[in-house]
């Protein structure tokens, strides 16, 4: 079983760089966005809340694996440092998490939507997303072109 470690966003980039260099965690297996809900007074001290990310890292040298969790309780402007300068594979995944959860990755070279249209309002994987608040209108256009023999 792999170790699971929580890191505050402010220390994330430095700690990930340390894991890459000192622990030889050279392979980013996955990076997944999460919405653990709103923090509550009755939560146990070790319960993760807010919007965040889980990183699964592996060392191809030692075979060691670790999962890193980080989160922010700021639901209005959630920000987490980018690790795309450490693992290039994070580039695509961070854009996906931004698209679906609205988490902005500080330092990312191209932080824009990946799957959803630019005029899409909200982030569909968040627990506070209510698709009933807006009407989504799809407009499909199809151009027909008649091809006549001999022309």
PLM region spans:
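Terminal low-complexity/charged segments
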Residues: 1-151
């Amino acid at each position: 079983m792999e170790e699971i470690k929580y890191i505050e966003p402010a220390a994330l980039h430095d700690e990930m760089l340390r894991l890459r260099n000192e622990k030889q965690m050279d392979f980013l297996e996955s990076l997944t966005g999460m919405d653990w809900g709103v923090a509550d007074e009755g939560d146990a001290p070790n319960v993760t809340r807010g919007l965040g990310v889980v990183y699964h890292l592996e060392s191809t040298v030692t075979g060691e694996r670790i999962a890193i969790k980080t989160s922010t309780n700021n639901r209005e402007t959630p920000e987490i440092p980018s690790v795309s300068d450490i693992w290039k594979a994070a580039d695509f995944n961070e854009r996906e998490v931004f698209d679906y959860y609205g988490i902005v990755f500080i330092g990312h070279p191209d932080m824009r939507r990946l799957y959803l249209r630019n005029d899409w309002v909200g982030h569909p994987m968040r627990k506070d997303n209510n698709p009933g608040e807006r009407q989504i209108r799809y407009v499909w256009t199809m151009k027909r072109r008649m091809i006549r023999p001999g022309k």
